[in-house]
């Protein structure tokens, strides 16, 4: 992939994936982010045995499982993949300082690397990224806030074609009173509108670290690694932002016909946490 192509594709994929992560669980606009001024504490990047390593103690995967044949380029896209939601919700606790509504207006790219060409770009580039995100779906008896993934897919319109991001996984890999780091994996498809032909498919793994700032805002560092359909890394990009708190968490008891309060209580009981049922 040429550097010029990398500069077009990576931001587009990042915007789609960030939009998916940002979708608010219950909002009409579907949410996630904002930034004011890029953080001065830039993401530090190095490589180790061919892997991109954030100086967070977290590494990107050296490989991912290949995309199934029916989702690879040349196949016809099945629109049924866009119907319905997650059959099984994955619940995880988040720090109380993360719970709430956050707004982002822009991000700054601080690093990108195309593995095939060897092209590396350490220049900073700020771009608009207007998003609002909700963190927090349910609260347990002790006041702890829990989240789950209600939005497993997102679609972005590009005129003659659209891109689809299908979430495979999202989970916190580290959570303390000072930071939380999420790992997310997506399958991304480019689909021609008229023919429904899949013209490209690839994978993306994102590592996102949130840290509370003294002024009440949120410092966010993001690393997005793109993999080809076979699961081999082809490029990586690092972004930073500051997200502004816009309000408290908007907890959700019901969503698209699902009783989330009951499902959360069942999750707690099934995991020997019945004492936390609200």
At which residue positions do the language-model features occur?
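Amphipathic/hydrophobic helical signal segments and adjacent flexible N-terminal regions
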Residues: 26-101, 105-134, 236, 245-278
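Short helix-loop boundary/capping segments
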Residues: 158-241
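Bacterial N-terminal signal peptides that target proteins for export
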Residues: 2-13
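Short, charged, low-hydrophobicity "junction" segments
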Residues: 72-81, 151-161, 189-196
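N-terminal chloroplast transit peptides
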Residues: 1-3, 21-28
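Intrinsic-disorder/low-complexity loop/linker signature
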Residues: 49-50, 143, 178, 231
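N-terminal glycine/threonine-rich, aromatic-flanked beta-hairpin/loop signature
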Residues: 114-168
